[in-house]
Amino acid sequence: QVGVVIGGGNIWRGRFTDEMNPVSADQMGMLATIINALAVQDAILRQGVKATVFTPQEMTRFAEHYRADRAIERMENGEIVLLAGGSGNPFFTTDTAAALRAVELKADAVFKGTTVDGVYDSDPHKNPAAKLIRDITYQEAIDRDLRVMDPSAFQLCKEQKLPEIRVFNMDDLGNIQRVAQGEAIGTRVHG
């Protein structure tokens, strides 16, 4: 069963706009995730696979209003569930929305696709000597302030005992399939 939390950074990085009201910027980011989810849904449907977009915002012409029981039912019926619109609230990242949805949907894991190979001991974009960490606990990631995901996402997964987050580089498209098949790439973050 597959649920995918969709990001919107390719369309909107509004949190970096200092002059804009942060609530408006976050709302624009949520809308960007919905645009992306509709594009992903179209690509999946063209492959002959059923997919439904869910949003916490009322947008019934484009997507179903999110309820965990409905999303679980769709997944149990073989559909791919696309979760867009973040948590529906400003000031919460897509990482936190992914953790929240994973807990609500009783997921076994979160696969976090990003632009680096996993969790590093420092930002590899700023420090070429940064070292990849293959295995780390939620608490260690929080204590060391490792920012590949926001600390509130790690904290929620820890508190709710989500078995693991797998952080991997999704720039290599083959990695999505590899991680879905259980290959131990990237970093395993766990309780």
Question: Which residues fall in each region the model found?
Answer:
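C-terminal catalytic "cap/lid" subdomain
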Residues: 1-191
